[in-house]
Regions:
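N-terminal secretory/targeting leader peptides
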Residues: 1-37, 52-198
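Active-site-adjacent segment of FAD-dependent monooxygenases/related oxidoreductases
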Residues: 37-43
Length: 198
């Protein structure tokens, strides 16, 4: 395979630093904003650590952050949440890795599954609460047909980053100007993604 794309935090089962680059766990007001995360990434050593993470995973991949957005919603619930006891009664679809573990650590039954499996799982009762993204993408999935209580600003995805990946051998075979073009395209995608989400 020559390339691909995914959300950076999907790699957190392979390397815990993937959460730092993809979806730091800390909600608004206590964690990094998208703007402060990008300042760290581009101007304060974050990019070098991102490249090091890929080297340490040994996957023969060159990654590029391409989509920086957030914050995401806490999610959809059958009944209002007025306390942690209310929250803990749900089987809650969460992202994999550290976000899911964080919810488990506070007593929430965290279940990880792909986006396309969420609505069928809600309809079958396999889960009874879910998060995916934010209002527009969530409405496309149709969660509002099953769940009526929606809470914005989640604990887990204040900054959300997606990547593009190039097979390491393919990347090494590119001319310098092609590698430079990949860097420029990545930065342009970040800018476009931010303006699209504003």
């Amino acid at each position: 395979v020559d390339g691909g794309a995914a959300w950076t935090h999907y790699w957190s089962n392979y390397h815990p630093a993937a959460m730092l680059f993809g979806s730091p766990v800390a909600g608004g007001g206590i964690g990094l904003s998208t703007k402060s995360w990008l300042a760290w990434y581009f101007d304060n050593g974050g990019k070098a650590l991102y490249d090091r993470m890929w080297d340490e995973m040994g996957m023969n991949v060159k990654g590029f952050v391409m989509a920086s957005s957030g914050p995401e919603a806490l999610g959809w619930f059958k009944e209002p949440i007025n306390s942690m006891a209310d929250f803990r009664k749900y089987r809650f679809r969460t992202p994999p890795g550290i976000p899911g573990q964080t919810y488990k650590d506070i007593g929430v039954a965290s279940v990880s599954m792909s986006g396309g499996d969420i609505l069928p799982a809600l309809e079958k009762g396999t889960i009874d609460a879910a998060e995916w993204c934010c209002p527009k993408p969530d409405s496309v999935f149709g969660f509002q047909k099953v769940l009526k209580n929606y809470y914005l600003q989640g604990l887990h995805q204040n900054v959300v980053n997606g990547d593009i990946y190039i097979n390491g051998d393919v990347y090494k075979s590119l001319a310098d100007h092609q590698k430079d073009a990949m860097e420029v395209a990545s930065e342009a995608m970040i800018t476009r993604n931010i303006t699209n989400r504003a």
